[in-house]
Amino acid sequence: HDALPILQEAINVQIAAEMWSSNLYLSMSFYFKKLGYDGFASWMRKQSQEELEHAYNLADYVSKRGGVAKVDKIDVVPQEWESVLDAFENVYKHECHVSSLIDELVNVASSEKDKASQDFLWGYVREQVEEEATALGIVEKLKRCKDEASILYMDEKQGEIGRAHV
């Protein structure tokens, strides 16, 4: 299929972006663990695993189409944030950024008239709607936390979610 070389390059860039996302969320997991927020740490580790799965799935797709998946340079991720809220605001901003990257991939597939890739990538578009909504929901709840006890309660709840999906 003639469209694959152009898409292959774009998807390989996305593979690196997904791996960077995985590293970012793993770094956040370590940050939360250091602060004693085991629930947030567990939830972020689950998110890290999901991003790595995205990279694997993208690589598998390139291979199925007869292309070659590559791992490009992955930049260093932040290690510290100002607060729990700041970290989750960064998660939300990052998920919005990932959505824009996925949208651009869909645009490339569309311009190349590659229906199979469009179909494959629409799954990521749908998933990003959920990822953004989840991150924004956590941010909005954290903004309502007025004391450490309420943050600890949220930490416990996110931990239950993180452990349930590992």
Regions found by a protein language model. Give the residues of each.
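Short, small-residue-biased leader/transition segments that mark boundaries at the very start
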Residues: 1-4, 165
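Acidic/histidine-rich alpha-helical segments that form the ligand environment
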Residues: 10-17, 21, 25-28, 32, ...
